[in-house]
């Protein structure tokens, strides 16, 4: 069985990690379907890393179609304990400019409830804590990694996750700004929630591509603009990830690693055997 302790999930513009040594393509299947694509597993800075393009190679999956449960479940099967998410985002703040990197510390859900957002269903219920959606340890590493890579980087801010795939209206953008949010994207949820349920530490490297549609001196966001900025910064994203991987202590502990300890409220005797089998890689230690 292939394994890795660190995972990287690449968003728009980051479809490969050419710095991986001895890369192997690994296809996995899960009880929740197939992941977005094959994993590329190799060595980076002396560590085993599993990379997955969130939208699939060729960008085939829109944000609502990304199989987040299959993706996170597969990372868990590989033994991943630390997951770095790289995402393209729009900025809702003047000082978070296109080309900058941001390490958000909060998240706000404005998806429409059409994306499956939990592993715990069909006879088992769990309520994980999610007050701090991003792992502080990994977020701090990403901050220092971005600085080491020479990026203009900002620490903190709330990332709003919208359903998409259309961009915001001006009214939506202005409302998000009035609420004090900093960034807007389409893919961090339910990914971050599922990572917490899978007891995987998770943090986001948000790469700003545009000012959404609120800025009076900038054109409204377009897909062409997003890809143009991402293409200009893909090497920077890869360098930040490389620096981050080098700093991660593979034996680190995070509150996320015990997120299910008091979260499963269904008594083991009442959980169907098929559900226990399906969730064994995620929660089996709590009812074995």
From Swiss-Prot:
It catalyses: S-methyl-5'-thioadenosine + phosphate = 5-(methylsulfanyl)-alpha-D-ribose 1-phosphate + adenine. GO terms for cellular component: cytosol. GO terms for biological process: L-methionine salvage from methylthioadenosine; purine ribonucleoside salvage. InterPro entries: MTAP, Nucleoside_phosphorylase_d, Nucleoside_phosphorylase_sf, Purine_phosphorylase-2_CS. The record marks 168, 223 as: Important for substrate specificity. GO terms for molecular function: S-methyl-5-thioadenosine phosphorylase activity. Phosphate binds at residues 12, 54-55, 87-88, 187. It comes from the Bacteria. Keywords: Glycosyltransferase, Purine salvage, Transferase. Substrate binds at residues 186, 210-212. Pathway: Amino-acid biosynthesis; L-methionine biosynthesis via salvage pathway; S-methyl-5-thio-alpha-D-ribose 1-phosphate from S-methyl-5'-thioadenosine (phosphorylase route): step 1/1. Its EC number is 2.4.2.28. NCBIfam families: MTAP (TIGR01694). Homohexamer. Dimer of a homotrimer. Catalyzes the reversible phosphorylation of S-methyl-5'-thioadenosine (MTA) to adenine and 5-methylthioribose-1-phosphate. Involved in the breakdown of MTA, a major by-product of polyamine biosynthesis. Responsible for the first step in the methionine salvage pathway after MTA has been generated from S-adenosylmethionine. Has broad substrate specificity with 6-aminopurine nucleosides as preferred substrates. HAMAP family: MTAP (MF_01963). Belongs to the PNP/MTAP phosphorylase family. MTAP subfamily. This is S-methyl-5'-thioadenosine phosphorylase. It comes from Chloroflexus aurantiacus (strain ATCC 29366 / DSM 635 / J-10-fl). The lineage of its organism: Bacteria, Bacillati, Chloroflexota, Chloroflexia, Chloroflexales.
